Amino acid sequence: MKTLIARHKAGEHIGICSVCSAHPLVIEAALAFDRNSTRKVLIEATSNQVNQFGGYTGMTPADFREFVFTIADKVGFARERIILGGDHLGPNCWQQENADAAMEKSVELVKAYVRAGFSKIHLDASMSCAGDPIPLAPETVAERAAVLCFAAESVATDCQREQLSYVIGTEVPVPGGEASAIQSVHITRVEDAANTLRTHQKAFIARGLAEALTRVIAIVVQPGVEFDHSNIIHYQPQEAQPLAQWIENTRMVYEAHSTDYQTRTAYWELVRDHFAILKVGPALTFALREAIFALAQIEQELIAPENRSGCLAVIEEVMFDEPQYWKKYYRTGFNDSLLDIRYSLSDRIRYYWPHSRIKNSVETMMVNLEGMEIPLGMISQYLPKQFERIQSGELSAIPHQLIMDKIYDVLRAYRYGCAE
């Protein structure tokens, strides 16, 4: 990461896409997409996804590392080209506890990530815990971030410290997109970004972390990009120019969250304006979902009723039976909920792919289609971009490859923006 940031600060148009997903097909696509390049691939886990207690994936940081490396070995992607990152590392998962208890767990969280070899650490102590004022004072956020940084430094080996990099910042959109409809978004003011940097510098130095400050590579700000279930707020470069100019006088770049669904031109403009780390998550699993839905429609037409997977019906049954991952985000009323479950840009369906019933139905669908010759006309109907690539000889009409290429469509836009 440090080399890439140095190149950006030297004037090169270069950025990196941060893949925030634990889905094996998304990770496989991210690695396979860059297998034949010289680029490194940044894959990040969030604190609620992966933590010392397992998170909602059931994986510790060490488990996640091995999970990613196993996929890399299968794909033929060199492990040393993978950068592992930890996102929102702090009391995010334990906000209902008092600050002392939550921070104690947060310290162990950060240590677990660093011990597991994660080298990009987002120190995010911005959330209020039980008994805390809302919002927290910037000084408190910075002091807690310094506690987390101290924890990281205390377990890092000398070799790890050479690679270790930190991201700071408190203006983080809701992970995975907004829960309610959005019309506009508040762009971070320069004075707030400067205050974030100033308070963190002061807190780090007070804890004897002056050297660790040199490892802070980025600050999280809101450049004016966001999405909810059916709306996207697109990047307006002119609105972010004060931020773009301010960061030029520092050693850092910006990290932009919730950049999903922007145009490829917007990604190029974001990187030009020093938002050099672009985080993406739901857009990748949304593309995966689109591919699976398309293949399910194809299966519906090609496979005899008694042999079909019933994939789409299984997904809906499971999500209505177990609504904990979408209920507080989506609209009420059966028809509205069904539309959101299927097509919401925030893609809460991503939490359900590991469910045994859904996983089995998708596997059945894939087996059903693997031995079939899918008519080109059907691929044109349901996967038109993939049809064009089949026509030009770039792609085969094999279900797994069709899913990969659908995810590649998202990664292609980021590659354009992060041009190297």
Curated annotation (Swiss-Prot):
Keyword Cell inner membrane included in the entry's annotation: no
Biological processes annotated in GO: D-tagatose 6-phosphate catabolic process; galactitol metabolic process; phosphoenolpyruvate-dependent sugar phosphotransferase system
One cellular component term from this protein's GO annotations in UniProt: plasma membrane
Family indicated by similarity: Belongs to the GatZ/KbaZ family. GatZ subfamily.
Name recorded for this polypeptide: D-tagatose-1,6-bisphosphate aldolase subunit GatZ
Gene of this entry: gatZ
Entry keyword Plastid: no
Pfam family, one: GatZ_KbaZ-like
Pathway membership, UniProt: Carbohydrate metabolism; D-tagatose 6-phosphate degradation; D-glyceraldehyde 3-phosphate and glycerone phosphate from D-tagatose 6-phosphate: step 2/2
Subunit field text: Forms a complex with GatY.
Primary role: Component of the tagatose-1,6-bisphosphate aldolase GatYZ that is required for full activity and stability of the Y subunit. Could have a chaperone-like function for the proper and stable folding of GatY. When expressed alone, GatZ does not show any aldolase activity. Is involved in the catabolism of galactitol.
UniProt keywords, alphabetically: Galactitol metabolism
Induction: Constitutively expressed.
SUPFAM superfamilies referenced in this protein's UniProt entry, alphabetically: Aldolase
